[in-house]
Amino acid sequence: MGLARLHAIVEGEVQGVGFRRYVQIHAVRLGLKGYAKNLPDGTVEVVAEGYEESIQQFLNYLWKGPPLALVTKVTHKLESYKGEFTSFDTY
């Protein structure tokens, strides 16, 4: 599998529950680069780049979330790899 870019919006109880840190830990473990960012509407935007296989595994973690989170929806699309990140950050 080649390189790809994931763009996802995660809905539910995902702010103030450690969701971004949880996402960051799993992204780094899977070798992904990008970011997780709280949005004003209560969702979390996630952009991650890396190998497609790792991105597919990562999607499972987005659905699961940390213990205090309650994920109700993950809207995502795979895009062309851009190689613009050097780490995985949270905002």
UniProtKB/Swiss-Prot annotation:
Reactions mediated catalytically: an acyl phosphate + H2O = a carboxylate + phosphate + H(+)
Record flagged with keyword Glycoprotein: no
Keyword hit for DNA repair: no
GO terms of molecular function: acylphosphatase activity
Family matches, as InterPro entries: Acylphosphatase, Acylphosphatase-like_dom, Acylphosphatase-like_dom_sf, Acylphosphatase_CS
Keywords: Hydrolase
EC number, as in UniProt: 3.6.1.7
Pfam families assigned to the protein according to its UniProt record, in alphabetical order: Acylphosphatase (PF00708)
Active site per the UniProt annotation: R20, N38
Residues covered by the Acylphosphatase-like domain: 5-91
Top-level taxon in the UniProt lineage: Archaea
Similarity comment: family membership: Belongs to the acylphosphatase family.
Record's protein name: Acylphosphatase
Annotated gene: acyP
